[in-house]
Amino acid sequence: MILYAAGAVLIAAVKWVVRIIGYLPKGVAAVFWLVFILPLPSQAHEFWIEPSSFQPDPGQSLTADLLIGTDFLGASAIYVPDQIETFALLGTGAKSQSERYEITGRYGDRPAGKMAAGSPGLRIIVHQTAPIRLIYSDAKKFDEFAREKGFDDALNQHQGRGLPLDKITERYQRYAKSLIAVGGPEKMGTGQDRHLGLAIEIVAEANPYQWPPLQSMPVRLYADGAPLANAQITVFTRHNPRHVETAKYQTDKDGRSNFALLAGRDYLVDSVILRPMDGAVESGDAMWESIWASLTFQVPSNQKM
């Protein structure tokens, strides 16, 4: 009951932030974002890409929101060039290596990404943030975040390293992907997600847009180029904006996991690595590093005509 109440308060706060930012001039909104929103991510807030359409027509104008939030409800990030290392639309076909469209914008743009959907087939939107530093003045908050993401022993490790509890420093970086299906029924289900070589990455091993709809989704988690075993992934299933289900899974020895799918739903898959940084005290660097992966897609409810 307490957790439910806390979640309700957090969701209400996110909605309040979204409303406030919407009324602000672009320049003021940018400052508001940098001061109040950027510090949120490592406090167990997911980061994901949400396109204006998961199934656009060929060449259709498309936007991509960068969202920070919880339970698949978030505040839309503005375009901040200094906080972006990669933002692109990629192909998945035989010529996928040459099918790359860099997504750029102006400081303060929201949604952060604007693009044309391109030719028919599966497309990948990828976004990589620059590293951001965070300070926890409360060890309890660090412990809550670590436990939520599957690192129950992190605080004990921290104390075992002889590090202070009143100033826990962390450096984090985000790696987000979104799968969209461009085109009509003749192209429904063509193309395949692929490993892009991100520091942490979730790869869909089946096309979620194939028809008839998949009954389950096999995914594989990679870290530093290799499959990551025994890692937690969290799956958010959005039936509608007010109805989101959450489930947690573990990857097997080959970095794979599998979860059930329902037609007509949106999915967010999330995974985090939290690891100590050696020599942090001597170098003045962060004590911990976290890297975050997310993948969004939609399962169609009917074949697009």
Question: Which stretches of residues belong to each language-model region?
Answer:
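Short, ordered, surface-exposed loop/turn motifs in non-cytosolic proteins
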Residues: V80-D82, A226-T237
